[in-house]
């Protein structure tokens, strides 16, 4: 074979790169998705092996004229998409299907038929980012080089597309509903026809559900006019067929009793572990951090040794919870299933495009305990659908009233913090035995993992992940009962068991802590890791300022742990300042003794500034301490410090953002608006980072 000269090699390299670009659509060098995320084989999903990624082809094959795409991180957007599909079918006769954005391609949307419509239900994740399953969709439409399959040179390639858009966001974040706003703006440049307004739901204001209900009615009216639809009386048409299988018992090895995947059911779980396939991790250590008896805060060490799971300092760990026994019993009792809890059921999608959210076959008990979000807040729209199945006329009238009057619903249900079963118990003691289980599967979202900021450094302990979590058990204003966190009380039960309690019952709750078929025995918990952009500067000599009251200190424990380890190796570590707040120094000062160890290792480079809100006549919070140390903060910012905030988004994070702008303006003799602009500039440059929740 003749030897290739340099030019030949260059030409071959160019051809190779071009071929890869063509066949992979550039995915090798696209902006990275979550490196820990996996699309995974979704149950009954549209994009299983052998299934098309061409949405137009899929709609033609299945006779659909309406597709509802969703971009969802926690399941809410997916739930809204399912509700829109169901309502469109039952009220207007649309042939609907629900579609996961990551399961389809978009290059052929320029050929989308004019007699069909596409919905886009898009949640915004974090700081204005797309959800994991919407990354490629977002990059495609917001990139500078959008290209479609059609050879037409038309400047408006999507002129045939009719679309509907609704966004899910949180106004406590700076980039409120950025996903739907940016996608809608990108669409408008391409020439499609939007039906109705681009709706926006606000979780930060607690009005997401009512925002959705208020938006969809005028949207349906506009869509009916555009597609010449006729509204009809909505009658329940099941999406799923649920049948009891008397030939199987719960002991049968093919029956799911809470296992998350088939490999877990078969006793051969294997990676890669992801949001679709958790690792059953041993809890290596657990202890209480508070010194008071009426409140709990947990420190847990989760072992990931041998799992091939990895994390980086600042990432999140997801815990897959189980519902408390009392809530499982309540739910089964309310719907007349208590005596049938161990009956085996098969669940099948009536429509070929329907995705079954629960592994099947399973039992009523397992479905409610492990797979359904039965403790979630109640949807007024879903409550209204139960009227037809009420046990008597009096109950039916009350349900109709609740479903029809949002203020009354707010008073009787929302303010009481009721879940579905509690809401129905407040109406009548009679069971709602006539409610089809298929309707409950359709109306109640799948039990979702809960995410926690990792409170350890991957440099210091790569095989163990630390969690710092306050246990929720509070009486909220207006509520007649204690509201108890689903996952934190589950973790508290595991901690109690590990520390010698044979019958743990945190706040009166019990859990199946040994898991399905005792597969979690020995104190195990299902987990996966989610990537975060909340990261230390790559140069450890750069100063950092951290603001983290309460459990908001979690990632900063990892940050400081890492900087102490780097210093011990002889690396130069820059000024490291933590503003920490809690109620009292002798009650809930998290890691109080540990900070002293890091102080010894980092010396003058570590400064911890505390704010105790209940120790003096005046409440003192971290934002007050920030203002008191304005000169220090300003000096470090001039040295290119990165500023971090972790904790409550609604109040603390918003006030810290405001105070920082005021500090910059005052210290530099600038107008207030200039200080605000400089904080925004820091955000854009990645020098102001938030890991916040509401």
From Swiss-Prot:
Gene3D superfamilies: 3.40.50.360, NADPH-cytochrome p450 Reductase, Chain A, domain 3, Nucleotide-binding domain of ferredoxin-NADP reductase (FNR) module, Translation factors. FAD binds at residues 450-453, 468-470, 485-488, 693. Keywords: Cell membrane, Endoplasmic reticulum, FAD, Flavoprotein, FMN, Lipid biosynthesis, Lipid metabolism, Membrane, Mitochondrion, Mitochondrion outer membrane, NADP, Oxidoreductase, Steroid biosynthesis, Steroid metabolism, Sterol biosynthesis, Sterol metabolism, Transmembrane, Transmembrane helix. One of its GO terms (biological process) is ergosterol biosynthetic process. Binds 1 FAD per monomer. Residues 276-537 form the FAD-binding FR-type domain. Pfam families: FAD_binding_1, Flavodoxin_1, NAD_binding_1. It catalyses: 2 oxidized [cytochrome P450] + NADPH = 2 reduced [cytochrome P450] + NADP(+) + H(+). Induction: Expression is induced in the presence of benzoic acid. Expression regulation is particularly complex, involving regulatory promoter elements, differential promoter use and regulation at the post-transcriptional level. Residues 32-694 are cytoplasmic. It is a single-pass membrane protein. Signal peptide: none annotated. FMN binds at residues 72-77, 123-126, 168-177, 203. The chain crosses the membrane at residues 9-31. It is found in: Endoplasmic reticulum membrane; Mitochondrion outer membrane; Cell membrane. GO terms for cellular component: cytosol; endoplasmic reticulum membrane; intracellular membrane-bounded organelle; mitochondrial outer membrane; plasma membrane. It is an enzyme of class 1 (oxidoreductase). Its cofactor is FAD; FMN. Belongs to the NADPH--cytochrome P450 reductase family. In the N-terminal section; belongs to the flavodoxin family. PANTHER family: NADPH--CYTOCHROME P450 REDUCTASE (PTHR19384:SF17), NITRIC OXIDE SYNTHASE-RELATED (PTHR19384). This is NADPH--cytochrome P450 reductase.
